[in-house]
């Protein structure tokens, strides 16, 4: 769910062990703060970004999915800030 125009959302999401991920794109500037556990963010070109507790990731308009291959729940705090859509080559 996108934030309102010129607005933002803050949410905390728990990804259980074995979470398979769901590819999606957000039209926002996203800050992801890994609070506990570990997780991989897979980009549409296959690049994997591994995050562990304390790591921070910033992205804008990427196609991605969150995949928890670990044996513990990963908790991530997200801050999503409304932004203009970024056109990607395959759109």
Per-segment meaning from a language model:
Residues 67-91:
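Double-stranded beta-helix
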Residues 21-23, 41-42, 64-70:
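Short beta-strand His + acidic residue motifs that chelate non-heme Fe in jelly-roll/DSBH
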Residues 1-2:
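Compact, glycine-rich, soluble single-domain proteins
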Residues 8-27, 60-63, 82:
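Conserved short histidine dyad/triad with adjacent acidic residue
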Residues 45-62:
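Short acidic-glycine-tyrosine-enriched beta hairpin
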Residues 27-45:
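Glycine- and acidic-residue-biased ligand/ion/polar-headgroup-sensing regions
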């Amino acid at each position: 769910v996108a934030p309102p125009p010129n607005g933002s959302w803050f949410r905390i999401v728990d990804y259980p062990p074995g979470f398979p991920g769901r590819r999606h794109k957000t039209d926002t500037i996203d800050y992801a703060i890994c609070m506990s556990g570990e997780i991989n963010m897979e980009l549409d070109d296959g690049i994997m970004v591994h995050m562990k507790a304390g790591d921070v990731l910033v992205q804008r308009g990427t196609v991605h999915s969150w995949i928890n291959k670990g044996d513990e729940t990963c908790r991530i705090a997200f801050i999503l800030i409304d932004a203009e859509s970024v056109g990607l080559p395959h759109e």
